[in-house]
Amino acid sequence: MRASFFWLLPLLLILASVAQGQPTRPKPGIRRKPKPRPTPRFPQAPEPAEPTDLPPPLPPGPPSVFPDCPRECYCPPDFPSALYCDSRNLRRVPVIPPRIHYLYLQNNFITELPLESFQNATGLRWVNLDNNRIRKVDQRVLGKLPSLAFLYMEKNQLEEVPSALPRNLEQLRLSQNLISRIPPGVFSKLENLLLLDLQHNRLSDGVFKADTFQGLKNLMQLNLAHNILRKMPPKVPQAIHQLYLDSNKIETIPNGYFKDFPNLAFIRMNYNKLSDRGLPKNSFNISNLLVLHLSHNKISNVPAISNKLEHLYLNNNSIEKINGTQICPNNLVAFHDFSSDLENVPHLRYLRLDGNFLKPPIPLDLMMCFRLLQSVVI
């Protein structure tokens, strides 16, 4: 009997292992419920809309202490005449309260200025519309701002200078637009304008007529740099102090062009095509000229300068030699007498000549003439 038990024990172990490998059958009439699928923790994002380069407007800010303050702007409590609507992704000019004198609307997406843009704010003195997308300006909208003195419309898409500008305008900044037209008489009533900035546009020689600048009796700064001019603009206002003509294609300066500018102290004509042939003698020998920029041209000889010139930039030209005796405004022999009147010594303090075909040392006659020189780059 003990022997039969030893034979029975392996058989029971085999049957137990087979039973463990088979799945258990469910009881009749009972169905197993499928395991629930895990639900997403957050709802699925909607399908993306069509791509656009215009971000949505910013949500309204907190209520202001001023009931008339636009919700999309900021009205500083300590500066009640100012309204800050800059960098708000605005598509249009909000309703401006009448108390506002200083309006900041730069860095938005405004595309036009319709007639009703500043309907209630006729006391505006300062308007900044830089870096928008303005293409169209109603011909009457700016004329309704009689107190406007500073208008900034840089980095927009204007194709012409806006019309009917306010008479009291002092600064007009229109750089980095697409301006290729200046309407006739647009500046004729701007006697108070001191600064006109038209750099980085598409202005050509045909745009400037003999009467284009007529009326700008007190203009002090004119910036026409980075345009496509080949000639000097005609009839520039005589009161001008600073003239910027960098990065054009000007080859020639008419004889005596600068003689009618008694206050002209600053000239920039870098990156043009000026050569000795296009520079008449004494072109820049102007009594009150203090700073002269002529770098990156094709000049071979140092032009004649006046006693009062303090800074001269001639780098990156075609100059091969420099003669202090020839370019000295006064008689160099007189400077050997140290008891001579030092008031007549040339005022030149900074001279830049690098990027030419010159090599050190600096000529002695150059140093004898320009005794006040503090820096020479060669």
Swiss-Prot record:
The LRR repeat ranges on this chain: 91-110, 111-134, 135-158, 159-179, 180-203, 204-229, 230-250, 251-274, 275-299, 300-319, 320-358, 359-378
Which intervals carry biased composition (Basic residues)?
28-38
Can you supply one Gene Ontology CC term for this chain's record? collagen-containing extracellular matrix
Pfam family of this protein, just one? LRR_8
Q: Which residues are glycosylated?
A: N120, N285, N316, N323
**GO molecular function terms noted in the UniProt entry:** heparin binding
What GO biological process terms are annotated to this protein in UniProt? Answer: cellular senescence
Zinc in keyword set: no
The record's function comment reads: May anchor basement membranes to the underlying connective tissue.
Q: What is known of its domains?
A: The basic N-terminal Arg/Pro-rich binds heparin and heparan sulfate. Binds collagens type I and type II through its leucine-rich repeat domain.
Q: What is this protein called?
A: Prolargin
Per the UniProt record, the source organism is Mus musculus
**Per UniProt, what is the name of the gene that codes for the protein in this document?**
Prelp
